[in-house]
Amino acid sequence: MFSPADNIFIILITGEFILGILGNGYIALVNWIDWIKKKKISTVDYILTNLVIARICLISVMVVNGIVIVLNPDVYTKNKQQIVIFTFWTFANYLNMWITTCLNVFYFLKIASSSHPLFLWLKWKIDMVVHWILLGCFAISLLVSLIAAIVLSCDYRFHAIAKHKRNITEMFHVSKIPYFEPLTLFNLFAIVPFIVSLISFFLLVRSLWRHTKQIKLYATGSRDPSTEVHVRAIKTMTSFIFFFFLYYISSILMTFSYLMTKYKLAVEFGEIAAILYPLGHSLILIVLNNKLRQTFVRMLTCRKIACMI
Protein backbone atom coordinates (compact mmCIF):
# COMPACT_ATOMS: atom_id res chain seq x y z
CA MET A 1 0.00 0.00 0.00
CA PHE A 2 1.46 3.34 -1.05
CA SER A 3 1.59 6.31 1.30
CA PRO A 4 0.21 9.73 0.22
CA ALA A 5 3.81 10.89 -0.36
CA ASP A 6 4.42 7.88 -2.64
CA ASN A 7 1.27 8.63 -4.65
CA ILE A 8 2.27 12.28 -5.12
CA PHE A 9 5.78 11.18 -6.11
CA ILE A 10 4.47 8.72 -8.73
CA ILE A 11 2.13 11.36 -10.22
CA LEU A 12 4.88 14.01 -10.39
CA ILE A 13 7.57 11.71 -11.76
CA THR A 14 5.15 10.33 -14.38
CA GLY A 15 4.31 13.88 -15.47
CA GLU A 16 8.01 14.77 -15.68
CA PHE A 17 8.68 11.61 -17.68
CA ILE A 18 5.94 12.40 -20.22
CA LEU A 19 7.06 16.04 -20.60
CA GLY A 20 10.71 15.01 -20.81
CA ILE A 21 10.11 12.41 -23.51
CA LEU A 22 7.82 14.74 -25.49
CA GLY A 23 10.16 17.75 -25.22
CA ASN A 24 13.38 15.92 -26.06
CA GLY A 25 11.62 13.73 -28.61
CA TYR A 26 10.24 16.83 -30.33
CA ILE A 27 13.76 18.30 -30.73
CA ALA A 28 15.06 15.02 -32.17
CA LEU A 29 12.08 14.67 -34.54
CA VAL A 30 12.30 18.24 -35.89
CA ASN A 31 16.04 17.93 -36.53
CA TRP A 32 15.61 14.50 -38.10
CA ILE A 33 12.88 15.70 -40.49
CA ASP A 34 14.99 18.76 -41.39
CA TRP A 35 17.96 16.46 -41.99
CA ILE A 36 15.94 14.30 -44.40
CA LYS A 37 14.56 17.33 -46.30
CA LYS A 38 17.89 19.12 -46.72
CA LYS A 39 20.04 15.97 -46.99
CA LYS A 40 22.41 17.54 -44.48
CA ILE A 41 22.42 18.67 -40.86
CA SER A 42 24.07 21.64 -39.20
CA THR A 43 26.65 21.09 -36.47
CA VAL A 44 24.47 22.60 -33.74
CA ASP A 45 21.48 20.44 -34.76
CA TYR A 46 23.71 17.37 -34.83
CA ILE A 47 24.94 18.08 -31.29
CA LEU A 48 21.39 18.84 -30.11
CA THR A 49 20.03 15.59 -31.57
CA ASN A 50 22.68 13.53 -29.79
CA LEU A 51 22.08 15.49 -26.60
CA VAL A 52 18.31 14.91 -26.49
CA ILE A 53 18.76 11.18 -27.19
CA ALA A 54 21.15 11.01 -24.24
CA ARG A 55 18.66 12.96 -22.11
CA ILE A 56 15.83 10.58 -22.97
CA CYS A 57 18.08 7.78 -21.69
CA LEU A 58 18.89 9.74 -18.52
CA ILE A 59 15.24 10.54 -17.80
CA SER A 60 14.28 6.90 -18.35
CA VAL A 61 16.97 5.63 -15.96
CA MET A 62 16.00 8.18 -13.30
CA VAL A 63 12.28 7.37 -13.57
CA VAL A 64 12.95 3.62 -13.37
CA ASN A 65 15.14 4.26 -10.33
CA GLY A 66 12.39 6.34 -8.71
CA ILE A 67 9.67 3.75 -9.33
CA VAL A 68 11.91 0.96 -8.02
CA ILE A 69 12.54 2.94 -4.83
CA VAL A 70 8.79 3.23 -4.23
CA LEU A 71 8.08 -0.42 -4.99
CA ASN A 72 11.15 -1.77 -3.18
CA PRO A 73 12.84 0.70 -0.78
CA ASP A 74 15.48 -1.92 0.12
CA VAL A 75 16.81 -2.13 -3.45
CA TYR A 76 20.04 -0.37 -2.42
CA THR A 77 20.88 -3.23 -0.08
CA LYS A 78 20.84 -5.66 -3.02
CA ASN A 79 24.17 -5.70 -4.81
CA LYS A 80 23.22 -6.65 -8.36
CA GLN A 81 20.23 -4.31 -8.70
CA GLN A 82 22.14 -1.33 -7.35
CA ILE A 83 25.18 -1.98 -9.54
CA VAL A 84 22.99 -2.16 -12.68
CA ILE A 85 21.04 1.03 -11.85
CA PHE A 86 24.17 2.95 -10.84
CA THR A 87 26.09 1.86 -13.98
CA PHE A 88 23.35 2.97 -16.37
CA TRP A 89 22.86 6.23 -14.44
CA THR A 90 26.61 6.97 -14.54
CA PHE A 91 26.76 6.37 -18.30
CA ALA A 92 23.70 8.52 -19.08
CA ASN A 93 24.77 11.23 -16.63
CA TYR A 94 28.30 11.61 -17.99
CA LEU A 95 27.16 11.40 -21.61
CA ASN A 96 24.68 14.23 -20.95
CA MET A 97 27.30 16.34 -19.21
CA TRP A 98 29.93 15.99 -21.92
CA ILE A 99 27.56 16.55 -24.86
CA THR A 100 26.07 19.61 -23.12
CA THR A 101 29.62 20.86 -22.61
CA CYS A 102 30.27 20.35 -26.34
CA LEU A 103 27.15 22.42 -27.09
CA ASN A 104 28.26 25.24 -24.79
CA VAL A 105 31.79 25.26 -26.22
CA PHE A 106 30.31 25.27 -29.73
CA TYR A 107 28.16 28.32 -28.89
CA PHE A 108 31.25 30.10 -27.58
CA LEU A 109 33.43 29.28 -30.61
CA LYS A 110 30.80 30.19 -33.19
CA ILE A 111 29.41 33.33 -31.55
CA ALA A 112 32.33 34.92 -29.71
CA SER A 113 34.94 36.98 -31.52
CA SER A 114 38.66 36.84 -30.83
CA SER A 115 41.92 37.16 -32.75
CA HIS A 116 43.78 34.60 -30.64
CA PRO A 117 45.36 31.90 -32.88
CA LEU A 118 44.11 29.01 -30.71
CA PHE A 119 40.55 30.36 -30.76
CA LEU A 120 40.63 30.80 -34.56
CA TRP A 121 42.04 27.29 -35.03
CA LEU A 122 39.35 25.74 -32.81
CA LYS A 123 36.63 27.76 -34.55
CA TRP A 124 37.84 26.47 -37.91
CA LYS A 125 38.20 22.85 -36.76
CA ILE A 126 35.02 22.37 -34.68
CA ASP A 127 32.73 21.53 -37.63
CA MET A 128 35.20 18.98 -38.98
CA VAL A 129 35.83 17.07 -35.77
CA VAL A 130 32.42 17.23 -34.07
CA HIS A 131 31.69 13.58 -34.95
CA TRP A 132 34.91 12.46 -33.29
CA ILE A 133 34.29 14.69 -30.28
CA LEU A 134 30.84 13.16 -29.70
CA LEU A 135 32.29 9.68 -30.19
CA GLY A 136 34.90 10.60 -27.58
CA CYS A 137 32.11 11.70 -25.21
CA PHE A 138 30.45 8.31 -25.68
CA ALA A 139 33.74 6.45 -25.08
CA ILE A 140 34.58 8.45 -21.93
CA SER A 141 31.08 7.94 -20.52
CA LEU A 142 31.19 4.21 -21.24
CA LEU A 143 34.64 3.88 -19.66
CA VAL A 144 33.62 5.79 -16.53
CA SER A 145 30.43 3.73 -16.13
CA LEU A 146 32.39 0.46 -16.43
CA ILE A 147 34.91 1.69 -13.85
CA ALA A 148 31.99 2.69 -11.62
CA ALA A 149 30.51 -0.81 -11.91
CA ILE A 150 33.85 -2.43 -11.02
CA VAL A 151 34.48 -0.08 -8.09
CA LEU A 152 30.97 -0.56 -6.73
CA SER A 153 31.22 -4.34 -7.10
CA CYS A 154 34.54 -4.42 -5.21
CA ASP A 155 33.13 -2.09 -2.57
CA TYR A 156 30.17 -4.42 -2.01
CA ARG A 157 32.46 -7.44 -1.68
CA PHE A 158 34.61 -5.64 0.87
CA HIS A 159 31.62 -4.72 3.02
CA ALA A 160 30.16 -8.23 2.68
CA ILE A 161 33.40 -9.67 4.09
CA ALA A 162 33.63 -6.97 6.75
CA LYS A 163 30.08 -7.70 7.88
CA HIS A 164 31.12 -11.14 9.12
CA LYS A 165 34.20 -9.93 11.01
CA ARG A 166 33.65 -9.50 14.72
CA ASN A 167 36.31 -6.86 15.26
CA ILE A 168 35.03 -4.42 12.64
CA THR A 169 31.31 -4.41 13.40
CA GLU A 170 31.45 -0.72 14.22
CA MET A 171 33.10 0.10 10.90
CA PHE A 172 30.35 -1.68 9.01
CA HIS A 173 27.68 0.09 11.04
CA VAL A 174 29.16 3.46 10.10
CA SER A 175 29.45 2.35 6.46
CA LYS A 176 25.88 1.12 6.18
CA ILE A 177 25.71 2.71 2.76
CA PRO A 178 28.02 0.48 0.71
CA TYR A 179 27.69 2.65 -2.36
CA PHE A 180 28.19 5.95 -0.53
CA GLU A 181 31.89 6.47 -1.36
CA PRO A 182 31.66 5.52 -5.08
CA LEU A 183 28.62 7.78 -5.55
CA THR A 184 30.39 10.71 -3.90
CA LEU A 185 33.51 10.15 -6.00
CA PHE A 186 31.69 9.97 -9.33
CA ASN A 187 29.55 12.99 -8.43
CA LEU A 188 32.77 14.97 -7.96
CA PHE A 189 34.13 13.85 -11.35
CA ALA A 190 31.02 15.29 -13.04
CA ILE A 191 32.25 18.77 -12.08
CA VAL A 192 35.00 18.60 -14.75
CA PRO A 193 32.74 19.11 -17.82
CA PHE A 194 30.70 21.63 -15.83
CA ILE A 195 33.84 23.72 -15.22
CA VAL A 196 34.57 23.68 -18.98
CA SER A 197 31.00 24.92 -19.62
CA LEU A 198 31.42 27.59 -16.97
CA ILE A 199 34.64 28.85 -18.58
CA SER A 200 32.90 28.98 -21.98
CA PHE A 201 30.04 30.93 -20.39
CA PHE A 202 32.29 33.60 -18.85
CA LEU A 203 34.32 33.93 -22.06
CA LEU A 204 31.10 34.42 -24.03
CA VAL A 205 29.92 37.08 -21.54
CA ARG A 206 33.29 38.80 -21.94
CA SER A 207 32.89 38.66 -25.72
CA LEU A 208 29.42 40.25 -25.44
CA TRP A 209 30.79 43.00 -23.19
CA ARG A 210 33.55 43.83 -25.70
CA HIS A 211 31.10 43.67 -28.59
CA THR A 212 28.67 46.01 -26.78
CA LYS A 213 31.45 48.53 -26.23
CA GLN A 214 32.24 48.52 -29.94
CA ILE A 215 28.56 48.93 -30.85
CA LYS A 216 28.30 51.99 -28.60
CA LEU A 217 31.20 53.59 -30.45
CA TYR A 218 29.56 53.00 -33.83
CA ALA A 219 25.88 53.13 -32.85
CA THR A 220 23.48 53.16 -35.79
CA GLY A 221 20.22 53.02 -33.88
CA SER A 222 19.26 49.65 -35.35
CA ARG A 223 19.17 46.32 -33.54
CA ASP A 224 22.43 44.39 -33.78
CA PRO A 225 21.97 40.72 -34.81
CA SER A 226 25.28 39.68 -33.25
CA THR A 227 24.23 41.05 -29.86
CA GLU A 228 20.93 39.15 -30.05
CA VAL A 229 22.79 35.92 -30.85
CA HIS A 230 25.15 36.54 -27.93
CA VAL A 231 22.25 37.16 -25.54
CA ARG A 232 20.33 34.08 -26.72
CA ALA A 233 23.37 31.84 -26.24
CA ILE A 234 24.06 33.31 -22.80
CA LYS A 235 20.44 32.68 -21.77
CA THR A 236 20.76 29.05 -22.90
CA MET A 237 24.02 28.58 -20.98
CA THR A 238 22.63 30.36 -17.90
CA SER A 239 19.64 28.01 -17.83
CA PHE A 240 22.03 25.06 -18.09
CA ILE A 241 24.08 26.33 -15.12
CA PHE A 242 20.92 26.79 -13.05
CA PHE A 243 19.42 23.39 -13.86
CA PHE A 244 22.74 21.59 -13.46
CA PHE A 245 23.25 23.20 -10.05
CA LEU A 246 19.77 21.97 -9.04
CA TYR A 247 20.57 18.52 -10.45
CA TYR A 248 23.92 18.32 -8.66
CA ILE A 249 22.45 19.35 -5.29
CA SER A 250 19.66 16.79 -5.77
CA SER A 251 22.22 14.07 -6.57
CA ILE A 252 24.15 14.90 -3.40
CA LEU A 253 20.88 14.81 -1.43
CA MET A 254 20.13 11.32 -2.77
CA THR A 255 23.70 10.21 -2.02
CA PHE A 256 23.42 11.32 1.62
CA SER A 257 19.76 10.30 1.98
CA TYR A 258 20.53 7.07 3.80
CA LEU A 259 22.02 9.08 6.64
CA MET A 260 18.59 10.64 7.18
CA THR A 261 15.66 9.25 9.15
CA LYS A 262 13.25 9.98 6.27
CA TYR A 263 15.61 8.63 3.63
CA LYS A 264 12.88 7.43 1.26
CA LEU A 265 11.21 10.85 1.23
CA ALA A 266 14.59 12.52 0.65
CA VAL A 267 15.31 10.23 -2.32
CA GLU A 268 11.87 10.89 -3.82
CA PHE A 269 12.29 14.66 -3.47
CA GLY A 270 15.79 14.44 -4.95
CA GLU A 271 14.56 12.41 -7.93
CA ILE A 272 11.79 14.91 -8.74
CA ALA A 273 14.18 17.87 -8.52
CA ALA A 274 16.94 16.11 -10.48
CA ILE A 275 14.72 15.28 -13.48
CA LEU A 276 14.09 19.01 -13.93
CA TYR A 277 17.61 19.28 -15.39
CA PRO A 278 17.18 17.10 -18.54
CA LEU A 279 13.55 18.28 -18.80
CA GLY A 280 13.79 22.01 -18.08
CA HIS A 281 16.94 22.78 -20.06
CA SER A 282 15.54 21.05 -23.15
CA LEU A 283 12.33 23.12 -22.92
CA ILE A 284 14.48 26.27 -22.68
CA LEU A 285 16.35 25.15 -25.80
CA ILE A 286 13.03 24.88 -27.66
CA VAL A 287 11.97 28.38 -26.57
CA LEU A 288 15.31 30.02 -27.47
CA ASN A 289 15.93 28.15 -30.74
CA ASN A 290 14.20 29.94 -33.64
CA LYS A 291 13.64 26.83 -35.77
CA LEU A 292 12.27 24.72 -32.91
CA ARG A 293 10.08 27.53 -31.58
CA GLN A 294 8.65 28.48 -34.98
CA THR A 295 7.94 24.84 -35.86
CA PHE A 296 6.10 24.40 -32.58
CA VAL A 297 4.04 27.56 -33.19
CA ARG A 298 3.13 26.34 -36.68
CA MET A 299 2.04 23.00 -35.23
CA LEU A 300 -0.24 24.76 -32.74
CA THR A 301 -1.64 27.01 -35.49
CA CYS A 302 -2.41 24.03 -37.75
CA ARG A 303 -4.05 22.25 -34.83
CA LYS A 304 -6.29 25.25 -34.12
CA ILE A 305 -7.28 25.52 -37.78
CA ALA A 306 -8.04 21.78 -37.91
CA CYS A 307 -10.20 22.07 -34.79
CA MET A 308 -12.11 25.01 -36.29
CA ILE A 309 -12.80 23.05 -39.47
Swiss-Prot record:
Main location: membrane
Extracellular side: 1-7, 72-82, 153-184, 261-266
Entry membrane topology: Multi-pass membrane protein
Any Gene Ontology biological process: detection of chemical stimulus involved in sensory perception of bitter taste
Coiled-coil annotated residue ranges, if any: none
Family: Belongs to the G-protein coupled receptor T2R family.
Identification of the protein by name: Taste receptor type 2 member 8
Gene name, Swiss-Prot/TrEMBL: TAS2R8
